[in-house]
Amino acid sequence: MLLLPSRGKLYVVGIGPGKEELMTLKAKRAIEEADYIVGYQTYVDRISHLIEGKKVVTTPMRKELDRVKIALELAKEHVVALISGGDPSIYGILPLVIEYAVEKKVDVEIEAIPGVTAASAASSLLGSAISGDFAVVSLSDLLVPWSVVEKRLLYALSGDFVVAIYNPSSRRRKENFRKAMEIVRRFRGDAWVGVVRNAGREGQQVEIRRVSEVDEVDMNTILIVGNSETKVVDGKMFTPRGYSNKYNIGEKRRAERMGASTKGGMEVARRSEEILRSFYPEEGLRGDIIRRCIATTGDVTIKDVIRFVGDTEEGVRALRDGCRIIADVHMVRAGLRRDAIVAVDFARGDDTRTASGIRNLAEMIEGSLVAIGNSPSAAFALCEVAEKHPPRFIVATPVGFVNAAESKEMVRKLPVPSVTTEGPRGGSGICAAIVNCLIEHADRPD
């Protein structure tokens, strides 16, 4: 059978959020050129003033395959514009068009026309919530199992991405939204969230809330979850890209002292340092670390169990070089003044979650600063991993009476500089205090 080439063409057109002013010129030209307009009724209604006199075919929600079949069939003889909200390739209809055309060997010219996404529209309305690396996650489990959605959200949050959340809730999926907010709260605390409803359309609503304040949302809402850098000032939500540091924009950052930066806080820190020096007067980085541990525990005798191996300044150099921090548990990460990857988030198998996570992060361990404040099993796993993938620096202070002392003794035998506690004493707070002291030294001007 002879297959004649198609005389038509299919445009898959992203019309943006809704308003004509946010539609690209190319999208308008494709709609103008088209003989047929095919689409979901809601999207077609948004461009009704642009399609007068054209043949229009609409289908209801969840009839995407029917729309694609109709559009491809018509495009064999006619110019067709298949309408998609936002951008057709981002949670739009374009992937289905391509997949169906390839699988069924449909001989039709297809051209995709990008559109302004809900994420970019919402970010602009909020201020500049998305400015650099970010992730986009849909909470809809109609096409993707919830277990996969949850895993993707976990990785996006653990990577400290700004996260744009599409399809946060519907009448049938309120539970997914609740679960997602619990995950966000676990990773980000009470972070800033931009809540934008009907971006670029009638009924537009723009709010900036804390995670704890986000309650009822619907399918017309997009959420933008800020990362560790995101700020809210004068009603604008923005995530700096680093220009302030590069070009000295704004006030010069005040040097921090024991985590304090305000005038009152600095005075308290100064007085605390005077008292701490009376307990332990040694100068330098090691003296600062021991004093920080005394301040954290309120126990002067903690100085007797802190152990240093190798060049402690290597931890400062590593942080100045921008090395990643890997912590065993969220409690350590919560106390740090820089972001960290948490081993338990990468756990698989029958081993303890921290040990499993450390092993699964083996290649990332190499060259990292590893902070273990809770789990002896994580310290044992680190010693195994370090043979092939040595970290650059280790802080290990797991606490307890089962294997804690033994695991730290193994860490001290590694050819890697480290700070540890001897015996059963330690804990996540001490671990975070030591790492923060290294961070403070790393942040000081040369």
Curated annotation (Swiss-Prot):
Keywords: Cobalamin biosynthesis, Isomerase, Methyltransferase, Multifunctional enzyme, S-adenosyl-L-methionine, Transferase. The gene is cbiHC. Residues 1-246 are annotated as: Cobalt-factor III C(17)-methyltransferase. Pathway: Cofactor biosynthesis; adenosylcobalamin biosynthesis; cob(II)yrinate a,c-diamide from sirohydrochlorin (anaerobic route): step 3/10; Cofactor biosynthesis; adenosylcobalamin biosynthesis; cob(II)yrinate a,c-diamide from sirohydrochlorin (anaerobic route): step 9/10. In the N-terminal section; belongs to the precorrin methyltransferase family. It comes from the Archaea. Transmembrane segments: none annotated. The keyword Lipoprotein does not apply. This is Cobalamin biosynthesis protein CbiHC. It comes from Archaeoglobus fulgidus (strain ATCC 49558 / DSM 4304 / JCM 9628 / NBRC 100126 / VC-16). Its EC number is 2.1.1.-, 5.4.99.60. GO terms for biological process: cobalamin biosynthetic process; methylation. GO terms for molecular function: cobalt-precorrin-8 methylmutase activity; methyltransferase activity; precorrin-8X methylmutase activity. It holds the Pfam family TP_methylase. It catalyses: Co(II)-factor III + S-adenosyl-L-methionine + H(+) = Co(II)-factor IV + S-adenosyl-L-homocysteine; Co-precorrin-8X = cob(II)yrinate. InterPro entries: 4pyrrol_Mease, 4pyrrol_Methylase_sf, 4pyrrole_Mease_sub1, 4pyrrole_Mease_sub2, Cbl_synth_bifunc_CbiH/CbiC, Cbl_synth_CobH/CbiC, Cbl_synth_CobJ/CibH_dom, CobH/CbiC_sf. Residues 247-446 are annotated as: Cobalt-precorrin-8 methylmutase.
